[in-house]
């Protein structure tokens, strides 16, 4: 999990670290080449400077969604670092790499995110992010993305932290929230919340998939019930980190 990379306190006087979230639709026969491009290209090239670091590289778990889909999250130090990174991709040393990457995928959807006030991940200690491709156990994540009602966005963010996130602090919880995000201004849909949740107890996931949620867990006073006053649309991705993903 590389918990040492996390800094709880956001920077004063600015947004601090930005997070570039990308969903790649990879060409099936080039899947291994695509992964190698990130492991041997993007990750070490970013590590040559202080502006950005690759954090997560994860596949859609087999049978859980579109085939050959990869999710990556890259941390960018701040707005100025984002500008420098964009220029490297557009006309600098990353231009050739990006052109080669585009030949390995059909398309990519990207958005720039900032952490919610209560997100466990606020800043990132770049010096502590692994960049050498060291291998480790695979991990499963449930990435939930919600779209609160127009007049309930701010309230949803607060209550999601006060109620839902705190409910996962129990030792028996299936999930632990590693990061919670909303889109940066002007970069994507405004009313969106994304949670990166590590599946601590996979056996509970199987039980969740094969059983109906009991009525007592959907009764008034529960998050499943009360949160419907704030949103009723969301989607979940089941992700499996690569063996070398810096965070897992």
Predicted features, each with a name:
Residues 1-14, 32-33, 37-56, 62-67, ...:
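An amphipathic, aromatic/His-enriched active-site/gating alpha helix that lines ligand/cofactor pockets
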Residues 14-33, 117-203, 243-248:
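Surface-exposed interaction/gating patches
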């Amino acid at each position: 999990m590389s918990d040492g990379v996390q800094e709880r306190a956001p920077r004063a006087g600015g947004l601090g670290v930005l997070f570039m979230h990308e969903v790649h639709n990879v060409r099936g026969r080039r899947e291994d080449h695509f992964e190698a491009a990130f492991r041997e290209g993007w990750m070490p090239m970013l590590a040559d400077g202080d502006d950005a670091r690759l954090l997560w590289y994860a596949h859609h778990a087999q049978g859980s969604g579109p085939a050959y889909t990869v999710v990556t999250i890259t941390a960018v130090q701040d707005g100025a670092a984002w500008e420098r990174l964009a220029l490297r991709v557009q006309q600098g040393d990353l231009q050739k790499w990006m052109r080669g990457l585009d030949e390995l995928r059909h398309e990519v959807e990207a958005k720039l995110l900032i952490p919610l006030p209560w997100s466990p991940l606020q800043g990132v200690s770049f010096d502590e992010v692994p960049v050498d491709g060291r291998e480790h156990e695979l991990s499963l994540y449930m990435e939930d993305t919600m779209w609160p009602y127009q007049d309930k966005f701010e309230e949803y963010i607060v209550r999601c932290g006060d109620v839902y996130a705190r409910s996962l602090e129990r030792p028996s919880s299936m999930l632990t929230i590693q990061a919670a995000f909303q889109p940066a201004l002007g970069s994507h849909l405004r009313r969106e919340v994304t949670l990166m949740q590590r599946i601590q107890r996979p056996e509970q996931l199987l039980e969740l998939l094969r059983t109906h949620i009991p009525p007592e867990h959907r009764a008034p006073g529960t998050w499943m019930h009360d949160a419907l006053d704030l949103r009723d649309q969301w989607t979940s991705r089941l992700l499996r980190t690569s063996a070398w993903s810096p965070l897992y």
